[in-house]
């Protein structure tokens, strides 16, 4: 396991942006598998590989680049370290970024599932508030720890490992009828 971590560290050092994006996409896919198998209990025969691929695509093309880029911007807006800085970053993340990100995520997943603009709007009206409230139960504490203890280039990976559970929830929320 330590050897895998060292290899990941080397790759991250050589290609930080690419590795962060691949990590995010892969872990969004893992979250979807968990959603389908544990939350929805679809079994192997009922598992939608197409859905998992779509969710991974969202991870590669949206989650990885957007969240990774956001962390870089956040470090420029609020430079430094320490508890007060971590708290400020968490507050800005949760007040400004999380609501927009969540709405975009649900909209993109719905569009990839073939919903019309009107249907996407209905889904957002039905599911967005609940998803945002659930976000606030989980992410403030995670983000304070992330911003206080974790270096910039590891933040996306740390968040995505914690987010395996969150991604399972989001996949379920985004794909339920």
Swiss-Prot record:
GO molecular function annotation: channel activity
Subcellular location: Mitochondrion inner membrane
Example GO BP: regulation of mitochondrial DNA metabolic process
Marked site: Determines ion selectivity: 93
UniProt xrefs under InterPro entries: Mpv17_PMP22
Chief location category: mitochondrion
Transmembrane feature ranges: 11-31, 55-75, 95-115, 132-152
Keywords per UniProt: Membrane, Mitochondrion, Mitochondrion inner membrane, Transmembrane, Transmembrane helix
Membrane topology classification: Multi-pass membrane protein
Family (UniProt): Belongs to the peroxisomal membrane protein PXMP2/4 family.
Purpose: Involved in mitochondrial homeostasis, and control of oxidative phosphorylation and mitochondrial DNA (mtDNA) maintenance. Non-selective channel that modulates the membrane potential under normal conditions and oxidative stress.
Protein name (record): Mitochondrial inner membrane protein Mpv17
Organism: Xenopus laevis
Lineage: Eukaryota, Metazoa, Chordata, Craniata, Vertebrata
């Amino acid at each position: 396991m330590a050897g895998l971590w060292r290899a990941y560290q080397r790759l991250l050092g050589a290609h930080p942006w690419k590795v962060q994006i691949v990590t995010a996409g892969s872990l969004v896919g893992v979250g979807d598998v968990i959603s389908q198998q544990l939350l929805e209990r679809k079994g192997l025969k009922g598992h939608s590989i197409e859905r998992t691929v779509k969710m991974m695509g969202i991870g590669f093309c949206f989650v990885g680049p957007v969240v990774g880029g956001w962390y870089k911007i956040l470090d420029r807006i609020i430079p430094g370290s320490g508890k007060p800085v971590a708290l400020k970053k968490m507050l800005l993340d949760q007040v400004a970024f999380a609501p927009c990100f969540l709405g975009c995520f649900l909209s993109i997943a719905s569009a990839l599932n073939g919903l019309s603009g009107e249907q996407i709007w209905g889904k957002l009206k039905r599911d967005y508030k609940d998803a945002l409230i659930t976000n606030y139960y989980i992410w403030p504490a995670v983000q304070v720890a992330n911003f206080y203890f974790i270096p910039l280039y590891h933040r996306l990976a740390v968040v995505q490992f914690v987010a395996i559970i969150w991604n399972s929830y989001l996949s379920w929320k985004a794909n339920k009828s």
